[in-house]
Swiss-Prot record:
The keyword RNA-binding does not apply. One of its GO terms (biological process) is cell morphogenesis. Interacts with MinD and FtsZ. It comes from Vibrio parahaemolyticus serotype O3:K6 (strain RIMD 2210633). It holds the Pfam family MinC_C. Gene3D superfamilies: 2.160.20.70, 3.30.70.260. Belongs to the MinC family. Keywords: Cell cycle, Cell division, Septation. Cell division inhibitor that blocks the formation of polar Z ring septums. Rapidly oscillates between the poles of the cell to destabilize FtsZ filaments that have formed before they mature into polar Z rings. Prevents FtsZ polymerization. This is Probable septum site-determining protein MinC.
Length: 220
């Protein structure tokens, strides 16, 4: 029996780079710095470019090459309804994308919570598909914990925590001691140098609202 290809719709969480100007060199330098800070997270990651705030023309071929040279995979642009701009981007090999009008929701049927009782060592990756993740120990630097739902860490988070991996905007990250290399919820992320000192080494809850991460120190 011959099986033919099947084309179906789906959704993915992609990193979005919001440009404020058309200075390609500055953009490439910024991306290179991000890759050097968290290479296992950013290297060969697909990237969408939001150009809504850019005034003036963009050298799209140079932008695409710069993104690739920095270690990302340029996917498409969003944020412009100007047909001339869209045509220039398309000619350079960018897809023309539009943001979804409704946020991704949790799966209709969540999987049971995945519980990890041992420390997550450097180089390990734990993934809770379609559900929440609970780690009853520490997450070491160089380790990665991922969940389509929320993540609870009953120890120190020194590695990377990625919640809402399938786009769930309501996901949370809760940890007893925040020293993370990276935290991410539904595609929005902060690196360690973006986390303010008032939250460092504290018990915190991280949530997402209005396309930005929010941190709250927990008293309990």
């Amino acid at each position: 029996m011959t099986h033919s290809p099947d084309l179906k719709g789906s959704s993915f969480t992609l990193s979005v780079l919001h440009l404020s100007d058309n200075e390609i060199a500055n953009t490439v330098e910024f991306l290179q710095e991000k890759v050097s800070q968290a290479p296992s997270f950013f290297a060969s990651a697909p990237l969408v470019i939001n150009i809504a705030k850019v005034q003036g023309d963009i050298d799209f071929p140079a932008l695409k090459q710069g993104i690739a040279d920095a270690g990302f995979i340029p996917v498409g642009i969003t944020g412009s309804k100007d047909k001339r701009v869209q045509n220039l981007a398309s000619e350079a090999g960018f897809a023309i994308m539009s943001a979804s009008k409704s946020p991704s929701q949790a799966p209709a049927k969540m999987a049971p919570t995945k519980v990890v009782r041992t420390p997550v060592r450097s180089g390990q990756q734990i993934y809770a598909k379609d559900g929440d993740l609970v780690v009853l120990a520490h997450v070491s630097a160089g380790a990665e914990v991922i969940a389509d739902g929320s993540i609870h860490i009953h120890g120190t988070l020194r590695g990377r925590a990625i919640a809402g991996a399938s786009g769930q905007q309501e996901a949370r990250i809760i940890c007893h001691d925040l020293q993370a290399e990276l935290v991410s919820i539904a595609g929005d992320y902060w690196l360690s140098d973006q986390i303010e000192s008032e939250y460092w080494q504290k018990k915190v809850m991280i949530s997402k609202a209005e396309e930005s991460l929010h941190l709250e120190v927990l008293a309990i």
